[in-house]
Amino acid sequence: MNKTNKEILRLALPSIVSNITVPLLGLADLTIVGHIGNENYIGAIAIGSMIFNIMYWILGFLRMGTSGMTSQAYGKKVWEEAIRVLFRALTIGVGMGIIFIICQSVIEWIMICAMNTPGSSLPLVHSYFHIVIWGAPAMLGLYGLNGWFIGMQNTKIPMLIAIVQNLINIFASLLFVFGVGWKIEGVASGTLIAQWSGFLIALFFVHRGLKNKTFYTSLTITQLSFSLFKSTLTHIEAWQRFFSVNRDIFLRTLCLVAVNLFFTSAGGKQGALILSVNTLLMTMFTLFSYFMDGFAYAGEALSGKLYGANNKNGFMQMVHSLFGFGGIMVILFTAIYTLSGKNFLHLLTDNSSVICASLPYLVWTYFIPLTGVAGFIYDGIFIGMTETKGMLITSAIAMVCFFAFYYIAKPFWENNALWIAFLLFLSLRGILQFFWAKKFVLNRFSASNKKI
């Protein structure tokens, strides 16, 4: 195995482990509330978690933009700029979290109305939301911190933070629910404590990672904070670039959110059974995404580093290696879904009517790996290169094609049209990004490449 492949695996594998911990935590929360009351508790956790998932998913630009700009600073070995990128991300992330807390009643009303929350679950959702919202500054700050660690070529720390955070969440929730008797408030409090714990642990690792840097150790914390605050606020051009990069990623994320929410909504309009079928089958995309996101994160870190170092040959070798690993993932997941797709459905549910209704649509999941792989890899490359305009334009075009195809084909193919439209969306993202990269991305290495 060559050096590039080793670097990719070194960065990708911890990220995959981090991603896998996410559903395990959700399963733990559902298991806890499943033993404290009726179905309203389970529904409240599901709705409350979805509210925060949507909020934080939309703001994922904080992690991605920070990762790209930090990795470029890493490639140039300009450590002062790397820490300034983090300072900007923390300023925006924590600031937005505070705004969320101030506007929590308005946010709750909008999200509950949008999700058609059942009246029986409303008081429980209210209790959960108004506790967990106090973790918004920590969560959004942690987005910036995790992006910074990835940009600094370290995915082991985000993995460690995710594992510790999840363990704290589980044990704190168990203590508050069964020890103190707080019910859903106990689960929410466990989540809140875990979020702030993860944020503080991340700050500790930042301090430890920078303590051998001259510009960091030559100053006291007060002097450093003032120096960063002054230089960060007065560097207007850097702020403009920071907002430009994150604006593009934000709008691109809205395109992805629109497609995913519409997919769920369109399935729901076909009835509860089809909604259950689509939810079940979509877990195959989710599982594939957990693995591919790991390679995308590796692409972010290495693309930015190699671009910062103006190493075009190394960049091309890295791209070829990423697609090599992507090809392996396609073969592996296609084989698993084709040979064991039905068994996977039985693993997820024992409802025979849902399983039977899923079988006619199971074939579409076989194409998820092939159609989705390029989009994941190019996302990582584009983020590392901060080629965010290309990400936005290609995602917007793919989204428009998704809706156009669905509404044209819906009268003829119904739910099949929805799945084909989704596969078309995945395919177009990868195809369009390929042509964008060919025309715009590689040419950037011929420039002076002085701007971070």
What are these regions (language model features)?
Residues 24-43, 112-119, 175-182, 250, ...:
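Helix-terminus/linker motif at the lipid-water interface of multi-pass membrane proteins
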Residues 63, 131-151, 158-169, 187-203, ...:
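Short runs within selected transmembrane alpha-helices of multi-pass transporters and secretion channels
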Residues 1-15, 70-137, 179-246, 303-368, ...:
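Short alpha-helical transmembrane segments in multi-pass integral membrane proteins
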Residues 42-102, 139-157, 277-335, 339, ...:
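Small-residue-rich hydrophobic transmembrane alpha-helices
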Residues 10-29, 131, 142, 151, ...:
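Transmembrane helical elements of multi-pass membrane transporters/channels
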Residues 33-53, 119-124, 184-185, 237-245, ...:
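Interfacial/gating helices of multi-pass transporter permease domains
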Residues 35, 72-75, 151, 180, ...:
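Membrane-helix boundary and inter-helical linker elements of multi-pass secondary transporters
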Residues 3-36, 50-65, 69, 94-101, ...:
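N-terminal transmembrane alpha-helices
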